Amino acid sequence: MTKATDIRTKTPDELNDMLLELKREQLNLRFQRATGQQENTSQIRKARRDVARVKTIQAERARAAAKA
């Protein structure tokens, strides 16, 4: 799980890369769940929340740029 303070230090390009990586992780976790290979089901929730954190910070930056 990534903290919001760690995410805020990243550049926009790093955020996009991080978002793509998290989406891939979500996809892999969904496949593992569907095939019955997943042992730790809380990983899906953690990945989903990390995606939400990244998107929230991207939206905050977009709003700040629009105001400026």
Curated annotation (Swiss-Prot):
One GO CC term on file: cytosolic large ribosomal subunit
A Pfam family recorded for this sequence: Ribosomal_L29
Entry keyword annotation includes Ribonucleoprotein: yes
Keywords recorded for this protein, A-Z: Ribonucleoprotein, Ribosomal protein
Alphabetized SUPFAM superfamilies for the sequence: Ribosomal protein L29 (L29p)
MF GO annotations: structural constituent of ribosome
Alphabetical GO biological process terms: translation
NCBIfam families tied to this protein: L29
Record family assignment: Belongs to the universal ribosomal protein uL29 family.
Entry protein name: Large ribosomal subunit protein uL29
Species this protein is from: Acidiphilium cryptum (strain JF-5)
